């Protein structure tokens, strides 16, 4: 460990309340399960595009979350009410017909090939196979081979 980082950790440990003899549990208030739910106020959620809300949407939804009990479902309903009905000028999940600025090589398919991860997966599968053999009680040699394979494949695993 870096000496400066070690020094920082030692000072951090030295000045923690527990190290100074302060019992935080004794000084804290007991939790009241019947107490009110604390909700912090926040600004209203705006569309991420920065555009104004839909003109047909109501200005303030009756489902908008208040400072009382907050329910995620109510917030989602309020957001959808403020956004208004969906646009009908294009179908959902429509893609543009413009050509891609990055042409694909011939024979390219959109399906991801499992070959992309094979270089990393093959050593890991071998290590897993050795570990399974060792756990089944084949012999102590399996444990040794598992350790060697783990060390040899450390670069491929990014360790």
Curated annotation (Swiss-Prot):
Annotated stretches, region: Disordered: 27-107
Subcellular location: Host nucleus, Host nucleolus
Any one annotated GO CC term: host cell nucleolus
Compositional bias (Basic and acidic residues): 80-91
Keyword entries, A-Z: Host nucleus, Phosphoprotein
Effect of residue 122 to T: In strain: Nonneuroinvasive mutant HF10
Transport recorded as keyword: no
Consequence when changing residue 82 to K: In strain: Nonneuroinvasive mutant HF10
Keyword Kinase: no
InterPro entries to which the protein is assigned, alphabetical: Herpes_US8A (IPR017377)
Modification comment: Phosphorylated.
Family indicated by similarity: Belongs to the HHV-1 US8.5 protein family.
The protein's name in its UniProt record: Protein US8.5
UniProt organism field: Human herpesvirus 1 (strain 17) (HHV-1)
